[in-house]
Amino acid sequence: ESEQGVNDFNPTQLMWDVHPDRDREWFEKETRNMSRRQIAQELECNFNTSGETVIHPDDIKRIFQNVREPRHRAGFDRNYWIWEEYNSDYTYMLVADVARGDGKDFSVFHIIKLETMEVIAEYQGKPAPDVYGNMLFSAGKEYGNCLLVVENNSVGFAVLDKLKDLEYPNLYYSIKSTHEYVNQLEAEVMTNSVAGFTTSQKTRPLIVAKLEEFIRNKLITIYSSRTSNEFKTFVWNNGRPQAMRSY
């Protein structure tokens, strides 16, 4: 309202470098763990609006420079894309998102090579929960019984039950109250543990912030055109990060 002359306040913008004790070294240290959005709002007087991508356009452009065709397209629907096969010299983790079950979104998993933080395999499709559970079991076995981190939403529990029935040996468990990771062998004899990862109002902003931080700091490499394209439609909507409607 002050910018529009509606009230008697005089708008003033004070950039971070106005302060005499703040130099480029201070700025670099202060912003190391801040998202571009936080930097713009808190230090550059540039307040983001709805519709802006969560990932900065410059970072999205850089991500696309790494996009390449997978070496293999596997699975019953050919939607399991593989860029690199299992290598026993490395450690892997499989992270799985489970579709809601209404047919409007996809079940997706990514396999990450932890030493280099490369996403070396990916699936995106709409299999039934039991089929998806079998796929996760096979993919996890293929990559050395890697840790399976499966989202435990309503349908996710059905997928996790399938993996338990198949006796997969390396499922992600956490403490219900704190979301703290706990080893599977310990978790199976605890009463306050839960299989899978819980995406909640508490954990979702942390997940998004960490994703943005890893991309901005060039800590993760993504080869998939599908994932890269999703960053173009992952936007801020009234302060909440979410996919654009119809995407």
Residues covered by each model-derived region:
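N-terminal cationic and glycine-rich segments that engage phosphates or anionic surfaces
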Residues: 21
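Structured lumen-facing ectodomains of secretory-pathway proteins
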Residues: 194-195, 214
